[in-house]
Amino acid sequence: MGNKDFIFNCQFKKLILPNDLREELKKPLGKVFKEIDKVIKFINLKKPKKIISVGDIISCSLIKNKIISDIVIFDFKTRRGEVDEDVKKTLKKFFPIKIVNHPGTISKEALITIKNCVEKILTKKEKKQILVEGEEDLLVLPVILFSPLNSLVLYGHWQLGVVGVLVDEGVKKRVIRLLKKFKY
């Protein structure tokens, strides 16, 4: 199956993370940042076409620094449990689209919602927020897959800090290779 066929077909399936892929997904897909100031400098330097943040802490940190991502994906959780009330309060200001995505999976609903949100931020210039019931960690993969080139995808990495992925053809191909290893 070619990459374009895969991209089209994957949005109609629930993808299940195989155990043997977990270790590979711990590796960052982009540049690692330890401080929000460095993320902001990177944004100002690269001037990405769109900014998409996946994760409560990075999304809230951007908002507090007056940067509202074009798409914000959050679940009110961190690796240590629920986020604190300050983060919840900041993220609750939005009226998010609510979806279900169980841990270790990328739901069909999540795939379709992410694809639709990317289309909307490109055509209608609207900002979108997605509240995930379950877990949002793996959603960084379809976000990269569906994002336009030169977009910046930011996500929290529980051991390293924030990972910034400047979307190009190479990273899209890497994501497709990873997604092809998922079970249906």
What do these predicted regions represent?
Residues 52-60, 133-140, 160-161:
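Gly/Ser/Thr-rich loops at beta-strand to alpha-helix junctions
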Residues 69-76, 149-157:
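Short hydrophobic/aromatic-enriched beta-strand-loop microsegments
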Residues 128-154:
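Hydrophobic/aromatic-rich, well-ordered segments within soluble, folded domains that form packed cores
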Residues 156-170, 183:
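Short, flexible loop segments at boundaries between secondary-structure elements
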Residues 63-71, 87-90, 144-149, 169-172, ...:
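Short, solvent-exposed amphipathic alpha-helical segments in soluble enzyme
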Residues 94-132, 138:
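Internal catalytic-core helix/loop-beta-alpha segment
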Residues 92-101, 173-184:
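A polyampholytic, Gly/Pro-enriched intrinsically disordered region
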